């Protein structure tokens, strides 16, 4: 008897799912419930689901007023998430792509000074390569790796020099 009741419940659920698509607000809250979004990112995600740009901007303004949407909070979360794997330049570029203002970007990156960046680059290089470069080809490979991760050439060369003299930086 219980199996039949479950079967009937399953049969009615597809009809219920087709009844009404989620509202714009529901979509926004579902996305924001998963992770932080910048205003520009959330707008681009929601734009295909609305006919009226005014409705979308009104919703985004309301979410920002209520504290559900914050570029500052998004920037801080992104920096926290990426600071151990990427340099300041790469993180700043990602924030710029996400539409975060220069002021919010600068505020979020204040904790990443040159020494912090040096130590994270050192740790990253040790995890990836384990040994200092033995020839020019290997050195170029390690330089490219750190450059692709957003570290400046100055930091990269300091890290390589330190890894040769003291393998544990």
Which positions does each model-derived feature cover?
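An alpha-helical, amphipathic repeat domain used for nucleic-acid recognition
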Residues: 1-169
């Amino acid at each position: 008897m219980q199996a039949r009741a479950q079967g009937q419940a399953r049969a009615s659920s597809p009809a219920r799912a087709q009844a009404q698509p989620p509202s714009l607000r529901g979509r926004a809250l579902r996305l924001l419930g998963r992770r932080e979004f910048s205003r520009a990112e959330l707008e681009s995600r929601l734009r295909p689901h609305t006919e009226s740009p005014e409705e979308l901007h009104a919703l985004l303004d309301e979410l920002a007023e209520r504290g559900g949407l914050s570029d500052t909070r998004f920037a801080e979360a992104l920096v926290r998430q990426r600071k151990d794997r990427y340099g300041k330049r790469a993180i700043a570029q990602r924030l710029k792509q996400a539409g975060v203002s220069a002021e919010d970007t600068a505020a979020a990156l204040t904790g990443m000074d040159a020494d912090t960046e040096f130590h994270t680059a050192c740790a990253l290089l040790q995890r990836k390569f384990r040994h200092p470069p033995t020839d020019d080809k290997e050195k170029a490979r390690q330089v490219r790796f750190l450059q692709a991760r957003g570290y400046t050439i100055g930091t990269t060369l300091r890290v390589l020099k330190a890894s040769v003299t003291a393998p544990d930086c």
